[in-house]
From Swiss-Prot:
GO terms for biological process: arginyl-tRNA aminoacylation. InterPro entries: aa-tRNA-synth_I_CS, Arg-tRNA-ligase, Arg-tRNA-synth_N, Arg-tRNA-synth_N_sf, ArgRS_core, DALR_anticod-bd, Rossmann-like_a/b/a_fold, tRNAsynth_Ia_anticodon-bd. Pfam families: Arg_tRNA_synt_N (PF03485), DALR_1 (PF05746), tRNA-synt_1d (PF00750). One of its GO terms (molecular function) is ATP binding. The gene is argS. It catalyses: tRNA(Arg) + L-arginine + ATP = L-arginyl-tRNA(Arg) + AMP + diphosphate. The keyword ATP-binding applies. This is Arginine--tRNA ligase.
């Protein structure tokens, strides 16, 4: 319907240009949005207001001219002008109802498009250090990142999901020392415990597995513990593999899988970090000061220059990030999206500046970033801070065990990524309309229940009969529901383009509300065969869109609740 109205207004604008009412070069950028008050129609456009100045006319006068020039259409039953010049459109019932067969015909593909066909996108997300269990912040990144990948795939892009393992550096050394301390019989309360060591109960789990000589399978490698208490390298390799496996198990339970696991250590092993340093030095963008090597990132928009190589010869953490992103570019990913925590904000400018300094043909502003804010977990209104397993934070596994995968995924992705999120465990577990996951899933299950009742009553759905009488879906609640269904493809397209998965979550909440309102207002199981089947068809269309939307969120659509 929205596309139809845009086409009608474009045709009217073209006619006004031919009549000399509009300048020939006036931009016909038509915007049409659903109205908030249905007394003002189903859709509205401000085209007359945007064209009034180039036309040299009052907006309302121009609106009248545009309405007069609209081609006739069976899809529109009424057009009004409101306020200073808004044009309001009332959709004809028959036209609004055509979304029902469109949905039923398309099925699982309704809402999908090929707008990104032929384009490759790499999405890096989670990318947790293999030093402990995944925390709720990683969980939010996993939910947002995976939903974003699903959205991009739904709009035709070829998506590669990538996990970057920071398996080099001081934190890995601290992990190895912590596990070694446990292997040697120390506890976190002992004075000899490593100063920056990890203290969670999982460290003891790793140590016991190491002493038992276990073999760990993680992603691309098998590591067998040597059980030698003094072999720090062996302990390090085993601990990293063990915790990578644990993170993999958490992600599997969360319904998230990756195509590529990239190890930071491989950048050093393959000489890519040294090659990046060499290219930056040869490019003339570095200088020596106080025994360190600095990169002139201020030449590329940073607020100050950054140390690249420290006095002791070690690299700062952003240097391997530059090498890693150069590798992404060289792999042919012209579009890269990094979903990370907001604590990475300071690295965005540095990495982009480093990439520009390489003069490798990488465009400014590459890669894209989606940064999420922190998650606060509450129970009974009180913040939950600790996990028995991790010791210092709430883990993703804690949440999944508490409220299940569906609620965890939906809640973590249902708000704007740049907004702090309060995860209310009590709300996520509740079976009430206040719980958005329950509310949406219940709408799906409710349709399934109606279809079973129809079957049991000997009144199975007759699609042919339903399609002949969709025009009888003329109750205001039915029309509002059909209009909402028609907006789904646009929501998917916009959410993918804007990198905002929460738009799908909000749409599903609105759709569920419209469905429950309609269900409570009009009786489905009436004796009138024509009307009953038309309403069953509307229910089936609603069920399909809910299922499609929940799939984009990585959430199930149960048939019974």
């Amino acid at each position: 319907m929205k596309e139809t109205i845009i086409e009608l207004l474009e045709a009217a604008g073209t006619q006004l240009k031919q009549q000399g009412i509009l300048p020939a070069d006036a931009p016909l950028t038509v915007k049409v949005e659903p109205t908030k008050d249905k007394a003002h129609g189903d859709y509205a456009s401000n085209l007359a207001l945007t064209l009034a100045k180039p036309a040299g006319r009052k907006p309302r006068d121009l609106a009248e001219a545009l309405v007069a020039a609209l081609p006739p259409s069976d899809a529109i039953r009424q057009v009004d002008i409101a306020g200073p010049g808004f044009i309001n459109f009332f959709a004809a019932t028959d036209a609004a109802a055509q979304v029902v067969p469109a949905i039923l015909d398309a099925g699982d593909t309704f809402g999908r498009s090929l707008s990104g066909a032929g384009e490759k996108v790499q999405v890096e997300f989670v990318s947790a250090n293999p030093t402990g269990p995944l925390h709720v912040g990683h969980g939010r990144g996993a939910a947002i990142g995976d939903c974003l990948c699903r959205l991009l795939e739904a709009t035709g892009f070829e998506v590669t999901r990538e996990f970057y393992y920071n398996d080099a550096g001081a934190q890995i050394q601290n992990l190895a020392l912590s596990v070694q301390a446990r292997v040697q019989g120390l506890t976190p309360d002992d004075a000899a415990w490593p100063e920056d060591g990890y203290r969670g109960a999982y460290i003891n789990d790793v140590a016991q597995a190491y002493l038992a000589g276990e073999t760990v399978v993680a992603d691309d490698r098998d590591v067998t513990a040597s059980a030698a208490p003094d072999d720090l390298d062996a302990i390090r390799d085993f601990a990293v593999a063990y915790l990578r496996r644990e993170q993999d198990l958490d992600l599997k339970a969360f319904g998230v899988a990756f195509d590529v696991y990239f190890l930071e250590s491989s950048l050093y092993d393959d000489g890519k970090v040294d090659a990046t340093v060499k290219a930056l030095v040869e490019g003339g963008h570095t200088y020596e000061e106080d025994g360190a090597t600095w990169l002139r990132t201020t030449d590329f928009g940073d607020d100050k220059d950054r140390v690249m190589r420290k006095k002791d010869g070690g690299y700062t953490y952003f240097l391997p990030d530059v090498a890693y992103h150069l590798d992404k570019w060289q792999r042919g990913f012209t579009t890269v999206i990094n979903e990370q925590g907001a604590d990475h904000h300071s690295t965005v400018t540095r990495v982009r500046a480093g990439l520009q300094a390489l003069e490798a043909g990488i465009p400014q502003g590459w890669p894209d970033y989606v940064l999420h804010q922190m998650v606060l977990v509450t129970r009974s209104g009180v913040e939950v801070k600790l996990s028995k397993r991790a010791g210092s934070y709430v883990t993703l596994r804690d949440l999944i065990d508490e409220v299940g995968r569906d609620a965890t995924r939906f809640f973590l992705a249902a708000r704007r990524s740049d907004s702090q999120l309060t995860f209310d465990i009590d709300l996520a577990r509740s079976q009430s309309n206040d719980n958005p996951v329950y509310y949406i899933q219940y709408a799906h299950a409710r349709v399934c229940s109606v279809m079973r009742r129809a079957q049991d009553a000997g009144k199975a759905f007759d699609r042919d009969l339903a399609m002949q009488h969709l025009g009888r879906l003329d109750a205001p609640q039915e029309k509002e529901l059909m209009n909402r269904l028609a907006r789904y493809p646009e929501v998917v397209e916009r959410a993918a383009r804007m990198r905002e998965p929460q738009q799908v979550a909000q749409y599903l909440m609105d759709l569920a509300a419209d469905f429950h309102t309609c269900y409570n207002a009009v009786k489905v199981m009436v004796e009138d065969d024509e009307l009953r089947n038309a309403r069953l068809a509307l229910g089936l269309a609603t069920r399909q869109v809910i299922r499609n939307g929940l799939d984009l969120m990585g959430v199930s659509a149960p048939e019974e609740m």
